[in-house]
């Protein structure tokens, strides 16, 4: 459970994320592989498992995220990106499926690092 301070941070992050989406200043990291339903899949195939056929749909779902959907704020472990970046991790029901979403904002845009079926909190 997030603290009041963390919830305020998430609220600010979501406002910034929505502004970046409105400006189309977004990037989905589609080259990654993820574990979904116990199998390794590319990120785009994982979207199909949720019932998402168009990348633009993920941004519509992200715009509807609420503070209470966030369950963790963590640091980026991939030093190639930014070791100081905060990662915001969410769980949301989409198309009757439990979905795990990981987002961050860097100096360029809003990044969606994960958007796939929830594997009990991991990615």
Where are these predicted regions, by residue range?
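Enriched for short, Lys/Arg-rich terminal
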Residues: 98-100, 104-123
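Basic/aromatic recognition patch in beta-strand/loop cores that engages polyanionic ligands
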Residues: 80-105
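Compact soluble domain cores
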Residues: 1-84
């Amino acid at each position: 459970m997030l603290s009041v301070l963390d919830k305020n941070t998430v609220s600010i992050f979501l406002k910034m994320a929505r502004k970046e989406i409105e400006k189309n200043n977004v990037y989905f990291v589609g080259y990654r592989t993820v574990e979904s339903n116990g199998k390794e899949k590319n990120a785009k195939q994982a979207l199909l498992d949720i019932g998402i056929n168009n990348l633009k749909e993920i941004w519509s779902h992200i715009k509807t995220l609420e503070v209470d959907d966030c369950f963790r704020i963590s640091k980026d472990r991939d030093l190639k990106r930014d070791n100081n970046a905060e990662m915001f991790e969410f769980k949301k029901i989409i198309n009757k499926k439990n979905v795990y979403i990981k987002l961050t904002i860097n100096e360029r845009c809003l990044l969606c690092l994960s958007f796939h079926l929830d594997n009990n909190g991991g990615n």
